[in-house]
Amino acid sequence: MTKLIIHLVSDSSVQTAKYTANSALAQFTSVKPKLYHWPMIRNLELLNEVLSKIEYKHGIVLYTIADQELRKTLTKFCYELKIPCISVIGKIIKEMSVFSGIEIEKEQNYNYKFDKTYFDTLNAIDYAIRHDDGQMLNELSEADIILIGPSRTSKTPTSVFLAYNGLKAANIPYVYNCPFPDFIEKDIDQLVVGLVINPNRLIEIREARLNLLQINENKSYTDFNIVQKECLEVRKICDQRNWPVIDVSTRSIEETAALIMRIYYNRKNKYNK
């Protein structure tokens, strides 16, 4: 496989550059990437340390840096080394400025903007944690999204991922032969999404979990017939109420969350017309 070195340079957490790089790398199956992360680069001293690393290991540079002088230093250095140096959001900012007729602000402020979006995200994360695994069902009316599904169908990480996108998500497990919360009999406004998975895949995940916890007694947890019935019952519950169902067998958490968000915003846009 072809090796590819990528330096991610940022004056903050480097996540924007990282997500961009990984999205691009997904298009190259024959590439073996090596990503170097350089976060919180906010002065020339720190940047010079990074430049020495880049000089030692040549590769593509992706950056998100607000300070103009630091950007100039970085791009000039890469130009002299004849290596690509790409601003992840530079072109986007420029096009926004041209289209809107608004000048790019010259003053740079490294303090995070504690706006409504920031606090909405914090509240959503807190909500996801407090309403994980069927907890505090009396507060489901506060949720934007409710996830239901058998154990180990990625309900918790999906809820947290949704929370990082500002959406309050509660999740409720479905356990075979156990009564399901009576909220499903009520007319609710929240988006309810069922998560199911291929039974064989779910058994593999559950067995790995039990081995990790060194538990051998819970045979029904990995019994194929029971696992299959759990998934079928979740589908039945959702189908009867016109709730969407997502099969997570081959989906990453990010993909599952993205699909849920698409359903959520399509639904919201429809009702807001």
Swiss-Prot record:
Q: Lineage of the native species? A: Bacteria, Pseudomonadati, Pseudomonadota, Alphaproteobacteria, Rickettsiales
* Domain of life of the native organism: Bacteria
Give the NCBIfam families listed for this entry.
Answer: PRK05339.1 (NF003742)
Which reaction(s) does its UniProt entry say it catalyses?
Answer: N(tele)-phospho-L-histidyl/L-threonyl-[pyruvate, phosphate dikinase] + ADP = N(tele)-phospho-L-histidyl/O-phospho-L-threonyl-[pyruvate, phosphate dikinase] + AMP + H(+); N(tele)-phospho-L-histidyl/O-phospho-L-threonyl-[pyruvate, phosphate dikinase] + phosphate + H(+) = N(tele)-phospho-L-histidyl/L-threonyl-[pyruvate, phosphate dikinase] + diphosphate
Q: What family does the database annotate?
A: Belongs to the pyruvate, phosphate/water dikinase regulatory protein family. PDRP subfamily.
Tell me the disulfide pairings in this chain.
Answer: none
Spell out the molecular function terms from Gene Ontology: ADP binding; ATP binding; phosphotransferase activity, phosphate group as acceptor; protein serine/threonine kinase activity
Q: What is this protein called?
A: Putative pyruvate, phosphate dikinase regulatory protein
Keyword Transferase in record: yes
- Where is ADP bound in this sequence? G149, P150, S151, R152, T153, S154, K155, T156
Briefly state the protein's biological role.
Bifunctional serine/threonine kinase and phosphorylase involved in the regulation of the pyruvate, phosphate dikinase (PPDK) by catalyzing its phosphorylation/dephosphorylation.
The UniProt keywords, alphabetically, are: Kinase, Nucleotide-binding, Serine/threonine-protein kinase, Transferase
Query: What sections of the sequence does the record tag as coiled-coil?
Result: none
The record's annotation in InterPro entries points to: Kinase-pyrophosphorylase, PPDK_reg
Q: Does the keyword Ribosomal protein apply?
A: no
Q: Recorded E.C. number(s)?
A: 2.7.11.32, 2.7.4.27
